Amino acid sequence: MEVPVKKVLIISASPRKNGNSDLLCDEFARGAKEAGHEVEKIRLVEKKVGFCTGCYACQKLNRCVQNDDANAIVEKMLSAEVIVLATPVYFYSMDAQLKALIDRSVSRWSDFGRFKGTEFWHIITAADTDKSMMSATLEGLRGFMRDCMEGSVERGVLYGTGAYGKGEVRALPVFQEAYEAGKSC
């Protein structure tokens, strides 16, 4: 039986190209492509995404008035069937790049009913080996998914624990797990 092709959007918030969370994104993408899915990876560090100013003009316009890349990324999220959000953990939270995008997505809250059935994967990396140190980050991602992406489904969480130096995640079991997750999405 042939598996239907899915539109997979991977959002890497890693500030380092080939950093640990970025490498896990690449492995997820490799698995998803091998399974026949259409994959796009966005590196937020290569995009301009300013912080939300709380002006709420977006509530009238259905788009943010800031002229940067956030609107286009949110549009891609609206059309994806699988969304991967990947972030390193900085001081018990997601990094600023991903938080800014999440905040800026408020411009399309009225459309968030469109996420029914959208599958989410979370990739979280940290130097600490204790997964509980990532719980606040995961709760923030889950809160966004639960409260703003109503009807979406969490398919899995990949923990890149104990990965501090650039590329250290390659030696961890999660590296293979990311590939397998991509194949199974």
Identify the role of each PLM range:
Residues 96-97, 110-155:
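Short, glycine-/small-residue-rich phosphate/pyrophosphate-handling segment
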Residues 155-161:
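Beta-strand-loop-alpha "switch" segments that mediate conformational coupling across diverse proteins
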Residues 1-86, 90-111, 153, 165-185:
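N-terminal beta1-alpha1-beta2 submodule of the flavodoxin-like/Rossmannoid cofactor-binding fold
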Residues 13, 44, 125-127, 160:
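Cofactor-binding loop segments of dinucleotide-utilizing enzymes, especially the Rossmann-like FAD-
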